Amino acid sequence: MKEKALSIVILAAGKGTRMYSDLPKVLHKIAGKPMVKHVIDTVKSIHAKNIHLVYGHGGEVMQTRLQDEPVNWVLQAEQLGTGHAMQQAAPFFADDENILMLYGDGPLITAETLQTLIAAKPEHGIALLTVVLDDPTGYGRIVRENGNVVAIVEQKDANAEQLKIQEINTGLLVADGKSLKKWLSQLTNNNAQGEYYITDVIALANQDGCQVVAVQASDFMEVEGVNNRQQLARLERYYQRKQADNLLLAGVALADPERFDLRGELSHGKDVEIDVNVIIEGKVSLGHRVKIGAGCVLKNCQIGDDVEIKPYSVLEEAIVGQAAQIGPFSRLRPGTALADNTHIGNFVEIKKAHIGTGSKVNHLSYVGDAEVGMQCNIGAGVITCNYDGANKFKTIIGDNVFVGSDVQLVAPVTIETGATIGAGTTVTKDVACDELVISRVPQRHIQGWQRPTKQTKK
């Protein structure tokens, strides 16, 4: 039998009142990415035909933040329950496809669990995702007869026997489009809250003689939703520890897996060592034997073999060659490219600059919009003056150039191979090969000088 097409509905219209935030709840982040984006990425990996995103509160913000996502935006103008949300999406359902309902505030659901749920769906019935809890207090209980689900009973409506049930409803379900549209049209809001509940389709399916089965998730955290910042923080730490464990199993040496954050994708070689409180963002690749010191932040970087990044350095969109030494307290900004065996020291900032093989910028310097050749020494306090208040200009430094301390290189300027710039010089004109350039205020010696003294108050 031909496999049915799959469409996804992600419910994301809630206000998230308990977050105490102007930001829509589903846009709050786990591992640097909005919760709903985690869900979207997961369903994209299972090749859904359509992704319907039901939105309401903060719709303009959501559409702006998620403008590149391949979703069909479905407005739920009034939040009248989960069933009502699904009713808004129902006109887009095809009769001959499966419809999988998810929640935008459940970011940790995995593709494997969803595929298991879809595979379990009866031909014209419903498959629910459930989980067994030691303490199910507060959750809707799954009531079964002969293995099939006949009802979901909320805590307040459960009798003594039903309260003993430990299997609870996660809210995730899959059904075929034709049947689901029928059941959604039959929902009523005849309840204390005056809302339309998706759970009522279970009774409607049973009335039609359709089978309702339940698939149990192995890990409650996978289906945990977020209603407040405490829950958000709990999911963040769980997810980070899970990522850290995966890296440990892959051979990365983490000094403390509880104090490591991965907010993107990390690829790595062998014998990588990462100290505490390191943050990885975006796409980062680490070569073999890379060492990262405590408190470093790397975002969208490529790091070569045998590089050492010393504590509290910040690297963003940088490419670092083999055996480079960086830090402590260095900053590499976007557009930085360090060749092999370069040294970037403490309180040095590099921006949109190429530093050649073996060159050193070791202390208290700013190098921006520049090309630095091989085997150069850039002394302490050197500044490339690249901005005139309106435009940026480039500094070009050839090979084997020595730049002394406290030098200002006023761009645009070129310093050719082998030149030497004396300490305290302000360079405003090009320097030829092997020249020595010095520009200083003449030194004066004043004999008998006395320091001023403080005047006493009368």
UniProtKB/Swiss-Prot annotation:
Pathway: Nucleotide-sugar biosynthesis; UDP-N-acetyl-alpha-D-glucosamine biosynthesis; N-acetyl-alpha-D-glucosamine 1-phosphate from alpha-D-glucosamine 6-phosphate (route II): step 2/2; Nucleotide-sugar biosynthesis; UDP-N-acetyl-alpha-D-glucosamine biosynthesis; UDP-N-acetyl-alpha-D-glucosamine from N-acetyl-alpha-D-glucosamine 1-phosphate: step 1/1; Bacterial outer membrane biogenesis; LPS lipid A biosynthesis
Ranges for region Pyrophosphorylase: 1-229
Segments of this protein annotated with the region Linker: 230-250
Record-annotated active site: H363 (proton acceptor)
Binding positions for Mg(2+) per the UniProt entry: D105, N227
Keywords, sorted A to Z: Acyltransferase, Cell shape, Cell wall biogenesis/degradation, Cytoplasm, Magnesium, Metal-binding, Multifunctional enzyme, Nucleotidyltransferase, Peptidoglycan synthesis, Repeat, Transferase
Gene Ontology CC terms: cytoplasm; membrane
Binding of UDP-N-acetyl-alpha-D-glucosamine, residues: 11-14, 25, 76, 81-82, 103-105, 140, 154, 169, 227, 333, 351, 366, 377
Gene Ontology MF, one: UDP-N-acetylglucosamine diphosphorylase activity
Highest taxon, organism lineage: Bacteria
Coiled-coil ranges from the UniProt annotation: none
Subunit structure: Homotrimer.
Biological role: Catalyzes the last two sequential reactions in the de novo biosynthetic pathway for UDP-N-acetylglucosamine (UDP-GlcNAc). The C-terminal domain catalyzes the transfer of acetyl group from acetyl coenzyme A to glucosamine-1-phosphate (GlcN-1-P) to produce N-acetylglucosamine-1-phosphate (GlcNAc-1-P), which is converted into UDP-GlcNAc by the transfer of uridine 5-monophosphate (from uridine 5-triphosphate), a reaction catalyzed by the N-terminal domain.
Name of this protein: Bifunctional protein GlmU
Annotated source species: Pasteurella multocida (strain Pm70)
Taxon lineage: Bacteria, Pseudomonadati, Pseudomonadota, Gammaproteobacteria, Pasteurellales
